[in-house]
């Protein structure tokens, strides 16, 4: 089977499920990165998570890689008002979450910064991509209360 035929076959297999997901209330989420120029069809998914953003060097602010790219994705909501666009903060080995989450004042300030960032860029929310609370994959020691701090951060973000 030719590669192009295989790709068409795979697309044909998943497309009805994708459209069905939108009509049944299921969520179809796509991560779209700052470093690609691909613009997704806003009717194929229910949510776009823009990858990536992070916790600022001050430990409480929010930033996004390539805000112009992010705004391009937000404009897709003009074509499909039901589409939700979120900023994914963190990612593999990234985030600076632990010091912020372990401090109540910083946590609350960060939550306010997330809200302000969403308002400023017309985002529908934030995706926290913290890998992995209490089990740092980089080999560094994680604080013993990191899982609890993660829970507190989620509470404050709500």
Description of each model-found segment:
Residues 1-22:
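Bacterial Sec-dependent N-terminal signal peptides
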Residues 126-133:
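Mobile, glycine-rich extracellular loop/lid and propeptide segments
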Residues 22-118, 134-135, 142-156:
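Glycan-recognition patch characteristic of GH18 chitinases/ENGases
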